[in-house]
A protein has these predicted regions:
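Short aromatic-glycine-(Arg/Gly/Cys) micro-motifs in beta-strand/loop hairpins
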Residues: 8-22
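A short, exposed loop/beta-hairpin motif centered on an aromatic-Gly-Thr core
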Residues: 23-32
Length: 71
C-alpha cells in the first residue's frame, strides 16, 4: 500500500512525520531518513491495531476464517 506522509521540522530540530490518512499516526526521527523509517513502523502498527479492532467488533457467530488472497 502507498501512503502519503508529511514531514515537518520541529523547534527542537527533530523531524515529525505524520500520515494524514490514518488519524493519530505520527512519529519522529533525528533526521528525515529516521523519521521515514519510524513512520513506516507506525503505519504498520496502526493498520494492525485497526485490523484487531475490526475483528473484535465482529459478532462471535460470524465464524471468522483466515484466507489467502493473491493481489
Amino acid at each position: 500500500m502507498i501512503f502519503h506522509v508529511t514531514l515537518e521540522k520541529a523547534e527542537d530540530g527533530w523531524i515529525v512525520a505524520e500520515c494524514p490518512a490514518l488519524p493519530g499516526c505520527v512519529s519522529q526521527g533525528k533526521d528525515e531518513k529516521e523519521a521515514l523509517e519510524n513512520i513506516k513502523e507506525a503505519i504498520t502498527a496502526w493498520l494492525w491495531a485497526e485490523d484487531q479492532r475490526a475483528a473484535a467488533a465482529l459478532p462471535h457467530e460470524a465464524g471468522v476464517q483466515p484466507i489467502v488472497v493473491s493481489v
